[in-house]
Amino acid sequence: MFAVPYGALPELGQALRDSIKGKVVIDACNPFPRRDGEIAERAREKGAGLMSAELLPGARIVRAFNAVGADRMGQAHEEPGRVGMPIAGDDEEALDIASTLIREIGYEPVRIGGLEMGKY
């Protein structure tokens, strides 16, 4: 799982290229132009899911944990039922793996589509 400033993804993608190839990577990074600069602008135009796939070549990307705020996540276990966690990805097996992990920590994965749906 990557949960870093979006601007760090180009360097991480290069540094970890061999390590992440073929691995499921849950991408919880959101592009904020004021913080992350030009790469965030590009991600906002293209869509963060598709841009992350370019920046992390060979990884099996699943976008998750970036559409529900931290405050809401922290309150999720105080209420009955499960909070839905939107996830997006193009690899069905990677989505299944991510869904299992998300359920194990108490959320309900909600598949919203492919990486093109993982906009921000």
Name every feature range the model reports, one short phrase each.
Residues M1-V24, C29-D36:
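Rossmann-like NAD(P)-binding element
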Residues A3-V4, A43, G89:
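Conserved residues at beta->alpha junctions
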Residues P5-A8, A67-V68, D91-E92:
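Short beta->alpha connector loops
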Residues L9, E45-G49, L95:
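A general structural signal for well-ordered alpha-helical segments in protein cores
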Residues E11, D71-R72, I97:
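Phosphate- and divalent-cation-binding pockets in alpha/beta enzyme and binding domains
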Residues I26-P80:
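Glycine-/Pro-rich loop/turn segments that contact NAD(P) or position catalytic residues
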Residues E54-I61, E78-G118:
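Internal alpha-helical scaffold of NAD(P)-dependent oxidoreductase catalytic cores
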Residues G69-D71, E116-Y120:
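A short acidic, often aromatic-flanked loop/helix-cap motif at beta-alpha or helix-coil junctions
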